[in-house]
Amino acid sequence: MAQTLNRSLTDLGALLHLVDPTLPIGGFNHSNGLETFVQQRVVESKATLEEYVQTQLLQNWIYNDGAYLSLAFDAMNEGNFDRLCELDWQLSATKVARESREGSFKLGVRLLKIFIRYETHALLTAYQKAIAEKRVQGYFPIVFAMVAQAMGLTKADTLYAFYYNAAVGVITNGVKLIPLSQMDGQDILFDLRGSLVQAVELSFDPDEEWLGAATLANDIRAMQHEVLYTRLYMS
């Protein structure tokens, strides 16, 4: 019993560390198009911010970052390094907005730099070498999956943590940009509990025919963000 409990708590600690908002990777610098939506008054209230997060979660992330994370986790389980590289290349092709694309691999490289110091795994070492040699970019969802699997976390927990972390980031940025009260942000996060579980279920075994399915409005706003006159975020 004690051994099982200790393992469970160790896994929980690893998961909490992986989604710690204070990790020095720069995630708070990126809105991925949300800032444009706010400036255009498309997202301007608690209701519209919640609708935006729900749309991102169930119409964007499950076919893009979440799906690639799911497939990368499987590739780690199989020890398939070539597959991990292939997923990195594919994800690069689907990220059409330059700022979002660059932001993702910058976050991934920084995340790997932190956790490779704690997790000994041949594929993490090989992937870091491939990044240094410019053979892969090191996108955040791929690295997140690799680190989580190396920690011994389950795929379901990893997906939930990834979506939760992404949702919290959007809500935090939205509360700041619109602006809204902190309690409004907490209400939105509470309302997302069921949707987060649904997202995990929908992307646990992703249909590769749907990889890269786009929310065009978000991609356009992410590209428009590059030329905003004033902005708080890098993407």
From Swiss-Prot:
Subunit structure: UreD, UreF and UreG form a complex that acts as a GTP-hydrolysis-dependent molecular chaperone, activating the urease apoprotein by helping to assemble the nickel containing metallocenter of UreC. The UreE protein probably delivers the nickel.
Keyword annotations from UniProtKB, A to Z: Chaperone, Cytoplasm, Nickel insertion
Pfam families: UreF
Function: Required for maturation of urease via the functional incorporation of the urease nickel metallocenter.
PANTHER family noted in UniProt: UREASE ACCESSORY PROTEIN F
HAMAP family: UreF (MF_01385)
A GO CC annotation given for this chain: cytoplasm
Chief location bin: cytoplasm
Keyword Cytoplasm in annotation: yes
UniProt name for this protein: Urease accessory protein UreF
Family of the protein in this entry: Belongs to the UreF family.
Keyword Cytoplasm among record annotations: yes
InterPro entries named among the record's database cross-references: UreF, UreF_sf
Top-rank taxon, per record: Bacteria
Transmembrane regions: none
Gene Ontology molecular functions: nickel cation binding
Disulfide linkage: none
Compartments it resides in: Cytoplasm
